[in-house]
Amino acid sequence: MGKVLIIDDEKQILSLLSRIIGLEGYEVFQAANCKVGIKQLEQNDPEVVLCDVCLPDGSGVELVSELKRLRPLSEVILLTAHGNIPDGVQAIKNGAFDYITKGDDNNKILPLIAKAMEKATVAYSQQKAVGKQYSFDTVIGRSPAIEAVS
């Protein structure tokens, strides 16, 4: 169904979100800080990342840029305990899919993950299709003359 990485330093939130999202059929990975989150992103290549704004080793708003640099097709949803408009605007500018308040409405999180997952899945599929269309074999060919050169 897809992979979701949750980055949050609050163990209860991490556990609750992991359980709820896992019950929907997603494969869930966890991280309690930015450093581990980046490592999990690189190792597991999730389509969707849920990230807390306030982390012990950095800001989730700033982390969005790094996550998008490493995995541009993954979608990042930022979670905050205290939403404010400037952080939300900056998060979107940095490439976040959305910015929501924790506990605001827990019924919003699963549909939001589904939308982000759909967008990421389409992007990954398009990238794969373009890669096949413009691979070495289709652009250069596999004639005996080309085989001799390569």
Regions found by a protein language model. Give the residues of each.
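Active-site residues of response regulator receiver
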Residues: 8, 52, 80
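Two-component/phosphorelay signaling modules centered on CheY-like receiver
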Residues: 11-29
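The feature encodes the CheY-like receiver
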Residues: 14, 56, 84
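Acidic catalytic/metal-coordinating carboxylates
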Residues: 33, 59-62
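Short amphipathic alpha-helix used as the core "switch/output" element in two-component signaling
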Residues: 39, 61-73, 90
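Active-site beta3 strand of CheY-like receiver
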Residues: 44-50, 55
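AAA+ ATPase active-site-proximal loops
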Residues: 129-150
